[in-house]
């Protein structure tokens, strides 16, 4: 139910790329009052001084205290929010975490992929995966919400409709490409301009850590274990994800049947567009939209998905989940494009 007063929101980690996008979306949200922005490196400065073009004039606070916020959007490095979330929940806030800390239900898998013991494993089963198209009803009563990664978002949109319908084999191959902002705002040698410009390379070929959450969600969709071959690539553009999934239809399944399945799936969301030709990332830049194309080649289904890694693959998905959780219009705060960086 929509609250009579505006929802009070705090963004923790507000000066990283995802945090900046969350802040921008909430600042323009008709049902939300942005009450705190927090970030260690720029603490004490006005937000508008730190983030180009921002109209938010709050002073950036140090620490991790959301104050009296009704909802906390945490955009912190992996392994940080896991220890802080219990305190935020105890203060009565709904927590929307943009890191990987609550995406997995298996604490052992978390340690394998993120290198540390999960400090609050008892919360893993409480967290709801914030992909509205898959978990809309569960999100309506969730207190701990975990925003999917950008690669998983695109991969799941490409594979889940067919797996749910039982029309493909449980063995999928996904080739995905990401812009540089997916690596975060902190400078590093591997994402510097001279290193990535005019060059494309694969990485994580032996296993990308986002694969673990993909496998959990794919298993839920298929009702059985799914074999996933996933290879990500870094490409020299600022933002965007393009994922191409190669799916093997079961005997008798036609291209038209598969397209109808994806059309029905897309019809359940205001943010999914089934398009007539393979999409370009530029068409969804700065938005919470996903463009999905279903193709067919020599008996293999080829499903291509384009999203913005900071939008549908990050902050946009977080705000979409917020809207569902608090009974707001699902498009609230998501009508305009956020184009920095």
Segments (PLM) and residue ranges:
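Short beta-strand or tight-loop elements
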Residues: 127, 226, 288-290
């Amino acid at each position: 139910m929509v609250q009579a007063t505006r929802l009070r929101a705090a963004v923790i980690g507000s000066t990283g790329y995802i945090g900046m996008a969350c802040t921008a979306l909430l600042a323009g949200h008709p049902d939300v009052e942005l009450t705190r922005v927090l970030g260690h490196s720029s603490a004490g400065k006005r937000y508008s001084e730190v983030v180009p073009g921002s109209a938010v004039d709050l002073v950036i606070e140090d620490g991790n205290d959301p104050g009296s916020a009704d909802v906390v959007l945490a955009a912190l490095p992996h392994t940080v929010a896991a220890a802080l979330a219990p305190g935020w929940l105890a203060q009565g806030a709904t927590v929307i975490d943009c890191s990987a800390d609550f995406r997995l239900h298996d604490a052992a898998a978390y340690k394998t992929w993120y290198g540390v013991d999960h400090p609050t494993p008892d919360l893993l089963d409480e967290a709801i995966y914030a992909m509205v198209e898959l978990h809309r009803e569960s999100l309506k009563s969730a207190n701990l919400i975990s925003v999917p990664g950008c690669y998983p978002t695109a991969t799941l949109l490409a594979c889940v409709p067919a797996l749910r319908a039982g029309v493909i084999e449980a063995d999928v191959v996904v080739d995905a490409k990401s812009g540089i902002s997916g690596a975060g705002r902190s400078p590093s040698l591997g994402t510097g301009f001279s290193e990535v410009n005019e060059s494309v390379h694969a990485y994580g070929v032996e296993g990308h850590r986002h694969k673990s959450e993909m496998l959990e969600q794919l298993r839920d969709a298929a009702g059985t274990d799914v074999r996933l071959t996933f290879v990500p690539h870094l490409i020299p553009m600022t933002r965007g994800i393009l994922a191409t999934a190669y799916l093997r239809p079961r005997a008798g399944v036609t291209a038209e049947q598969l397209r109808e399945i994806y059309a029905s799936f897309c019809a359940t969301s205001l943010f999914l567009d089934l398009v007539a030709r393979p999409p370009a990332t530029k068409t969804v830049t700065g938005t919470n939209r996903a463009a999905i194309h279903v193709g067919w080649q020599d008996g293999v289904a080829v499903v291509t998905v384009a999203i913005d890694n900071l939008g549908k693959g990050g902050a946009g998905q977080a705000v979409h989940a917020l809207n569902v959780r608090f009974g707001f219009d699902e498009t609230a705060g998501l009508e305009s494009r956020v184009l920095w960086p």
